[in-house]
From Swiss-Prot:
PANTHER family: ADENINE PHOSPHORIBOSYLTRANSFERASE, URACIL PHOSPHORIBOSYLTRANSFERASE, CHLOROPLASTIC. Catalyzes the conversion of uracil and 5-phospho-alpha-D-ribose 1-diphosphate (PRPP) to UMP and diphosphate. Keywords: Allosteric enzyme, Glycosyltransferase, GTP-binding, Magnesium, Nucleotide-binding, Transferase. Uracil binds at residues 194, 199-201. Coiled coil: none annotated. It catalyses: UMP + diphosphate = 5-phospho-alpha-D-ribose 1-diphosphate + uracil. SUPFAM superfamilies: PRTase-like. Belongs to the UPRTase family. NCBIfam families: PRK00129.1 (NF001097), upp (TIGR01091). This is Uracil phosphoribosyltransferase. GO terms for molecular function: GTP binding; magnesium ion binding; uracil phosphoribosyltransferase activity.
């Protein structure tokens, strides 16, 4: 079984609680999503490879460690994934960005792909798939399956919120993909929404219904 990393930092939990509020405005919800995703990036990339380089300070030459942001790809699952993309790019502005367009069939709850665009040479890159919610897991499973066809070095999945059903679905299909989240909520309802959840993340991010 794959691993689930719940990021319990007080700032992350505080902001998630503010996002849960029914009366949070679109502006507030969007800002909080951006802030949480930026904070989570520190933990998600804790084990990212580094390389040593020479540096000249104002006083002398020394060495330091840096990451190669160009080898990192944030893959946003459209459309809601774009709502947490900017926060992560704030921390790693040199990262490349890919997009997977998936929508949930309202009858089967299955994922249907309508768009796929990735940077070249994905075989040389580490991929972080992002989506605010890991609910039924169908979109996540489909996205990871599609990405594996491109042969990236590694894949991680990042979401603000998930539930036992979503975790089980992704790890059953892809036990090698770790999940990073701010919380694991109680369950799904009959419509495939997380309870207690934050509502429809895409609608709340973009002010649509």
């Amino acid at each position: 079984m794959g691993t689930v990393h719940v990021i319990e930092h007080p700032l992350v939990q505080h902001k998630l609680t503010m996002m849960r509020r029914k009366d949070a405005s679109t502006n507030s919800f969007r800002r909080l999503a951006n802030e949480i995703s930026a904070l989570m990036t520190y933990e998600v990339l804790r084990d990212i490879p580094m390389q040593e380089i020479d540096v000249e300070t104002p006083l002398e030459f020394t060495t330091g460690k840096v990451i190669d942001g160009k080898k990192l790809v944030f893959v946003s699952i459209l459309r809601a994934g774009t709502g947490i993309l900017d926060g992560m790019l704030t921390i790693v502005p040199g990262a490349r960005v890919g997009h997977i367009g998936l929508y949930r069939d309202p009858k089967t709850l299955g994922a249907v792909e309508y768009y796929f665009k990735m940077p070249g040479d994905l075989q040389e890159r580490d991929v972080v798939v992002i989506d605010p919610m890991l609910a039924t897991g169908n979109s996540a499973v489909a996205a990871v399956e599609r990405l594996k066809e491109c042969g990236p070095k590694s894949i991680k999945f990042v979401c603000l919120l998930t539930c036992p059903e979503g975790v089980a679905a992704l790890h059953k299909a892809h036990p090698d993909v770790p999940i990073y989240t701010a919380a694991v909520d109680r369950q799904l309802d009959e419509h495939g929404y997380i309870l207690p959840g934050i509502g429809d993340a895409g609608d709340r991010l973009f002010g649509t219904k």
